[in-house]
Amino acid sequence: DNVAGVIFHTRIADANPGEPDAVPTLSNIEIWDTAIGVAILGLDDQGMKIDKLRIRQTLRQGLLVGKPVGHPLRAREGDTPGAADNKFSMIDVSDANMSFGTYAGIEIYTSQSKFEASTSWFNKRNQGKNALYEVKTRHVGAGWFIQGTRNMFIGCTAQENAGHGWLVEWGNNQFIGCLGESSSFQDAVTGAARGDEAANWYIGRNARGSRFVAPRSHNPYSWAKASLYGFYIENNIRDMHITTASAKDDRIGENNMIGRRVHVTGAMGDNVLIEVDHIRHATFAPKQLEKRGNGVFMG
């Protein structure tokens, strides 16, 4: 129950070398049937290049980047998550949370890392709908759980997970051309869990400063219960933009998408922009650049 496929926990203790980052690499590895697939935890596990990983059937997380709040090593290391400043490409995680705990396929607690062309799919959940909307458990069976800042996600996918597709809790992250598809998928849930419960995109109120460019939410199967919401956004969110987005559900059809395409739980703060299909909603009035002398425009 405690075996991981790969663990990095590098600490260059007080040596103050000219290059403080360990700069390890991890490439072209398949990992099946472990407690955790890959865990990158160390303060000096930085400057890494991680690519072409296939991780399947883990009891807990498939990929864990950084130490979560409450991790005993995090408490001993100045409450820092570690594992910052890394690059990930072509990561494929599926069938995580086989222990039916509260784990997501990919959990990110670090900062300033980049993820491209990566997928987290078919992760498990047996807890009911309430668990998806409680702070301590809402990442159960999710594709991606992001409790870090200043990260970038480019062309990544959450597909057919039993929980939410993307759960974005913290701010100043960027998402470009990413997909959330068929969350709370009926073939991935078990026990008290059901289809038609989760969101393809769940954006928490502390995700301020984040930008979502061309994100898609899609339930493509006419025969399958999948996500309840396309974009579920908590109240009091501020400084958050979703642009050129789309939310489709081929089972219920376009005329039944009210309250499901976009669902915001209450009032929003300043500088919020939501553009999903035909919806254009902003909590600010657009301003023009000011023309100054010599034909210069400033804003």
Task: Label the model's feature ranges.
Residues T10, E30, G42, K52-Q57, ...:
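Short, structured patches in soluble enzyme cores that scaffold and shape functional sites
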Residues P17-L26, D45-M48, E77-F88, Y133-G143, ...:
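Glycine-rich, flexible loop segments associated with nucleotide phosphate handling
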Residues D21-S27, G47-L53, P72-E77, A83-V93, ...:
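All-beta strand scaffolds that present successive hydrophobic residues in beta-strands
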